[in-house]
């Protein structure tokens, strides 16, 4: 149903699978505030990666599921690996906002 891929570094969703989920998921943009202000997905909450990793319990609940994105998917992938090790249910949005802006939207 959803375009998930399982990798050694955790769960990943293709940018093509995100449109139908917007508004139904906990989407976190881990870019810095200045990057986020230059454009993000309208339902994304901005929590810079450093803040999120330094204090995940402040922002996340272990029983909930979160989708993490950044500009290219690299930072969010790193964050997902660490948060998964800490017991959080996170999914990396592969390609990030850069791929989203570059992809044809339906």
Protein language model regions, located:
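Short, surface-exposed ligand- or partner-binding patches at beta-edge/loop junctions that are enriched
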Residues: 69
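Rhodanese-like catalytic fold shared by cysteine-dependent sulfurtransferases
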Residues: 1-16, 21-25, 33-65, 74-106
């Amino acid at each position: 149903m959803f375009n998930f891929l399982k990798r050694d570094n955790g769960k990943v969703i293709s940018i093509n699978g995100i449109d139908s989920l917007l508004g139904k998921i906990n989407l976190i943009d881990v870019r810095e505030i200045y990057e986020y202000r230059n454009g993000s997905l309208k339902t994304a909450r901005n929590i810079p990666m450093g803040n999120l990793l330094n204090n995940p319990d402040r922002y996340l609940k272990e029983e909930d599921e979160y989708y993490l994105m950044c500009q290219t998917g690299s930072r969010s992938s790193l964050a997902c690996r660490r948060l998964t090790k800490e017991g959080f249910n996170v999914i990396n949005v592969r390609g990030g906002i850069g791929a989203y802006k570059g992809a044809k939207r339906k």
